[in-house]
């Protein structure tokens, strides 16, 4: 936009839009600024959709902002650290089970990155746990990964992820999420509980 002489980029929090007078009020560092406009495009950004289950957000954060990414990074690395300190095999297993919900581009990338971290990057970083034993599970409601991009590309993504050690569950819908894991319902009507300390909603 900097090459557009008639465009202006302004930092601030919009507090009021006056359509009749074609002005926008924004606050920055405690000061309100009024900016006139000829054309106004409102792009508030993307939010996470939990499909009417917003209570899932506490235990399965999304990844739409830098703050979200930092929170997830802390949860993922923290799970390895807690597993290292735990002497309870069941607790370790739960801590080393990472579930990514959603097989779109973000979920595919996230599952691949967690698998890469666990199965390659962190090898030898801990004394009491084998990070290569970490489970990374990717859950998708459709019959293929990357549904909007077609079955061929989805199949290629699935092959790559499986080579990284990602367990892929297709035709699966998450029906509940809590501190200790999540509940998944499959197309055949079966229901399964997955114990996991770290869940990511993508």
Identify the function of each model-found stretch.
Residues 2, 80, 118, 122:
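Conserved hydrophobic residues forming the short capping helix/wall of the S-adenosyl-L-methionine
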Residues 12-17, 115-202:
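A Rossmann-like FAD-binding core segment of flavoenzymes
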Residues 1, 33-34, 192-193:
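Structural alpha-helical scaffold elements that stabilize or flank donor/cofactor-binding regions
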Residues 7-99, 189, 200:
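FAD-binding core/adjacent interface of flavoenzyme oxidoreductases
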Residues 107-108:
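N-terminal Rossmann-fold NAD(P) dinucleotide-binding loop
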Residues 1-7:
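N-terminal glycine-rich phosphate/pyrophosphate-binding loop and immediately adjacent elements
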Residues 101-104, 142:
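Glycine-rich Rossmann-fold phosphate-binding loop(s) that bind the pyrophosphate
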């Amino acid at each position: 936009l900097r090459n557009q002489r008639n465009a202006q980029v302004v930092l601030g929090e919009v507090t009021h839009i006056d359509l009749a007078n074609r002005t926008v009020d924004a606050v920055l560092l405690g000061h309100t600024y009024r900016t006139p406009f000829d054309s106004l495009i409102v792009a508030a950004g993307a939010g996470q959709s939990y499909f009417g289950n917003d209570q899932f957000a506490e235990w399965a954060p999304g990844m739409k902002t830098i703050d979200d990414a930092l929170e997830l990074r802390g949860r993922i690395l923290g799970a390895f650290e807690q597993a290292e300190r735990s002497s309870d095999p069941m607790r370790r297993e739960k801590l080393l089970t990472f579930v990514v919900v959603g097989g779109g581009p973000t979920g595919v990338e996230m599952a691949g990155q967690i698998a890469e971290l666990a199965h390659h990057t962190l090898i030898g970083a801990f004394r009491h746990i084998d990070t290569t034993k970490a489970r990374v599970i990717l859950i998708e409601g459709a019959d293929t990964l990357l549904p909007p991009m077609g079955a061929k590309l989805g199949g290629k993504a699935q092959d790559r992820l499986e080579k990284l050690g990602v367990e892929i569950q297709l035709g699966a819908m998450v029906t509940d999420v809590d501190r200790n894991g999540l509940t998944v319902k499959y197309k055949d009507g079966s229901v399964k509980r997955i114990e996991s300390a770290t869940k990511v909603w993508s």
